């Protein structure tokens, strides 16, 4: 049986935590930042955890993580 392929886009976006969940960077912080408030940008700086319902989908895209 051939090896399973890792979804490269997902591999660049998600990291697995010790508890088995996936974390990623928040979106909306790359460009067009002048109209966004300092508070909004500050809250977007942190990492976010993927929703529990999406964990199985991400796990399927990242079989060796």
From Swiss-Prot:
GO molecular function: structural constituent of ribosome
Protein name: Large ribosomal subunit protein bL35
GO biological process: translation
HAMAP family: Ribosomal_bL35
Composition skew (Basic residues), residue ranges: 10-30
Family, similarity comment: Belongs to the bacterial ribosomal protein bL35 family.
The keyword Metal-binding appears for this protein: no
Listed Pfam families: Ribosomal_L35p (PF01632)
PANTHER family xrefs: 54S RIBOSOMAL PROTEIN BL35M (PTHR33343), LARGE RIBOSOMAL SUBUNIT PROTEIN BL35M (PTHR33343:SF1)
Location of region: Disordered: 1-30
Native species: Pseudoalteromonas atlantica (strain T6c / ATCC BAA-1087)
Keywords attached to this entry: Ribonucleoprotein, Ribosomal protein
Example of a GO cellular component annotation carried by this entry: cytosolic large ribosomal subunit
Domain of life: Bacteria
InterPro entries found in the cross-reference section: Ribosomal_bL35 (IPR001706), Ribosomal_bL35-like (IPR021137), Ribosomal_bL35_CS (IPR018265), Ribosomal_bL35_sf (IPR037229)
